[in-house]
């Protein structure tokens, strides 16, 4: 009875939560009765803590509404329920394709006999230096890391396919390799293939030229996990899309893991067939956003530590506050600072960094100003520049103004009072409220999250 009640609760949660929230946190849960207690099993500690913190009140309220004083007690645990299959709904897989001898790990079938046909060294494309342990986690990539970690522990499970999207240099490729390393660690016989989308196209063209298309199909449809970077490069390549469509279907039918990355949300990829874009969203889609200040500082400190350099905190904050677009830019700047320090023998101070990065810092300071942000946001939302300074409170004007204030706090070195002055003499508390409101909306609204990420890319390019 209580398990049936949980199924009804799932329906309520699916209605109330966004598709990403439901797929990320609710779908992986498994339920089973233990006496008068309903036990919800989470796949890992991260999911357990998140559900308990964010959704336990909603779940208990639903149980009370339905059963009053007879509502079951609720307990959380980590792992899989002892019996049968998960109660939570999952995409229904078609009949698995036939395989040769397989070694079972979790819910994924691993082919241990089929030999790579196109390139026997594909597994070596998984870079062993990219691990979850050296991936710096922050609010901007927290969901992406959690999903990737779950896939590495349970490939072919609830998050299949996993689609990661975001700008260049934000850590998507690092996560792909970390998943691959995790899968291979758990099962050394697993055939894990990582590649850029252009490599898939090149292999297909070569197969066509050599009259070996069937061999091509057998190889790609025999892998246990397929990770393809920058899927947007499939745009307008009709034959490649056709072949990948069938490969995608075959792998999912066999519950074999697929992870894809792109620089944009699946539905925004031009030149890719709708049937593919629809399939990209079958599992879980997660945005990887530019790192916030604290994460940028942590990245710099970790990189300096790995290089054997003592980086003062104030220097890390100085660099992080001025370079905001992506991880690659941060690491490149730090490498330049370290190289200059090694060549000159000078200590790494703020003045030294200002000198070593003077061209890079000058470019950043020139590009990102409050005025530039206001103009860019006004153009993006199709409102008048004067509205940024006006007292109008209609949502069509107030929301873009709040976005511009939040961007000004993140992308410039101006104080809250200075930002308020630039927006028509507003109080610093108004700016603080706007920043908090936009931070909240970025978690709750896909549209706001996308708008904010697009504006950061525009302003940082």
Swiss-Prot record:
* GO function term, MF aspect, one: DNA replication origin binding
Q: Any stretches that span the bilayer, and where are they?
A: none
Mind telling me which SMART domains this protein's record contains? AAA (SM00382), Bac_DnaA_C (SM00760)
Tell me the subunit arrangement: Oligomerizes as a right-handed, spiral filament on DNA at oriC.
Which Pfam families does the record match to this protein? Bac_DnaA (PF00308), Bac_DnaA_C (PF08299), DnaA_N (PF11638), Hda_lid (PF22688)
Which keywords label this protein? ATP-binding, Cytoplasm, DNA replication, DNA-binding, Lipid-binding, Nucleotide-binding
Instruction: Extract the ranges annotated as region (Domain I, interacts with DnaA modulators).
Output: 1-90
Task: State which gene encodes it.
Answer: dnaA
CDD domains in alphabetical order: AAA, Bac_DnaA_C
Naturally occurring in which organism (per UniProt): Shewanella frigidimarina (strain NCIMB 400)
Comment block on domains? Domain I is involved in oligomerization and binding regulators, domain II is flexibile and of varying length in different bacteria, domain III forms the AAA+ region, while domain IV binds dsDNA.
Q: Where is this region: Domain II?
A: 91-124
Protein known as: Chromosomal replication initiator protein DnaA
For this protein, the record's Gene3D superfamilies field holds: 1.10.1750.10, 1.10.8.60, 3.30.300.180, P-loop containing nucleotide triphosphate hydrolases
What this protein is reported to do is described as:
Plays an essential role in the initiation and regulation of chromosomal replication. ATP-DnaA binds to the origin of replication (oriC) to initiate formation of the DNA replication initiation complex once per cell cycle. Binds the DnaA box (a 9 base pair repeat at the origin) and separates the double-stranded (ds)DNA. Forms a right-handed helical filament on oriC DNA; dsDNA binds to the exterior of the filament while single-stranded (ss)DNA is stabiized in the filament's interior.
Region of interest called Domain III, AAA+ region, as start-end residue ranges on this chain? 125-341
Q: Which HAMAP family match?
A: DnaA_bact
Q: Does the keyword Nucleus apply?
A: no
Give the NCBIfam families listed for this entry. Answer: DnaA
Which BP terms from GO are recorded?
Answer: DNA replication initiation; regulation of DNA replication
| Cellular compartment(s) | Cytoplasm
Q: Which family does it belong to?
A: Belongs to the DnaA family.
Segments for region (Domain IV, binds dsDNA): 342-461
Residues the entry annotates as binding ATP = 169, 171-173
Q: Name one GO cellular component term.
A: cytoplasm
């Amino acid at each position: 009875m209580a398990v049936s009640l949980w199924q009804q609760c799932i329906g309520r949660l699916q209605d109330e939560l966004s598709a990403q929230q439901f797929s990320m946190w609710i779908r992986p849960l498994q339920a089973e009765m233990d006496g008068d207690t309903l036990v919800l099993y989470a796949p890992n500690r991260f999911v357990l803590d998140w559900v308990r913190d964010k959704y336990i009140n909603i779940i208990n309220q639903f149980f009370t509404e339905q059963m009053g004083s007879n509502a079951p007690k609720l307990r959380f645990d980590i792992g899989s329920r002892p019996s049968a299959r998960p109660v939570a709904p999952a995409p229904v897989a078609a009949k698995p394709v036939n395989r040769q001898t397989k070694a079972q790990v979790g819910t994924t079938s691993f082919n241990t006999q089929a030999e790579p046909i196109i390139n026997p060294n594909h597994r070596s494309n998984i870079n062993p230096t990219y691990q979850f342990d050296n991936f710096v986690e922050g609010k901007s990539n927290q969901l992406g890391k959690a999903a990737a970690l779950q896939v590495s522990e349970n490939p072919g499970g609830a998050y299949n396919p996993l689609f990661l999207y975001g700008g260049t240099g934000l850590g998507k490729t690092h996560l792909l390799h970390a998943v691959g390393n995790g899968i291979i660690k758990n099962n050394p016989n697993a055939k894990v293939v990582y590649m850029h989308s252009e490599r898939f196209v090149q292999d297909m063209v070569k197969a066509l030229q050599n009259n070996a298309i069937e061999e091509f199909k057998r190889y790609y449809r025999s892998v246990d996990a397929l990770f393809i970077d920058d899927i947007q490069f499939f745009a307008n390549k009709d034959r490649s899309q056709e072949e990948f469509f069938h490969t995608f279907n075959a792998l999912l039918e066999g519950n074999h893991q697929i992870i894809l990355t792109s620089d944009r949300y699946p539905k925004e990829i031009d030149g890719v067939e709708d049937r593919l874009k629809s399939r990209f969203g079958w599992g879980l889609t997660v945005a990887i956003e530019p790192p916030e200040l604290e994460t940028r500082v942590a990245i710099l400190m970790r990189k300096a530590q790995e290089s054997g350099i003592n980086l003062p905190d104030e220097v890390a904050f100085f660099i992080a506050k001025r370079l905001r677009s992506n991880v690659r830019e941060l690491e490149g700047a730090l490498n330049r600072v370290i190289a200059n320090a090694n060549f000159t023998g000078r200590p790494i101070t703020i003045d030294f960094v200002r000198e070593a990065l003077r061209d890079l810092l000058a470019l950043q300071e020139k590009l990102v100003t409050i005025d530039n942000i206001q103009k860019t946001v006004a153009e993006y939302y199709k409102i008048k520049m004067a509205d940024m300074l006006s007292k109008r409170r209609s949502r069509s004007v107030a929301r873009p103004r709040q976005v511009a204030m939040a961007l000004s706090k993140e992308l410039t070195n101006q104080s809250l009072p200075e930002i308020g002055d630039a927006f028509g003499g507003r109080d610093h508390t108004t700016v603080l409220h706007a920043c908090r409101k936009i931070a909240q909306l970025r978690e709750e609204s896909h549209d706001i999250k996308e708008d904010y990420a697009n504006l950061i890319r525009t302003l940082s390019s």
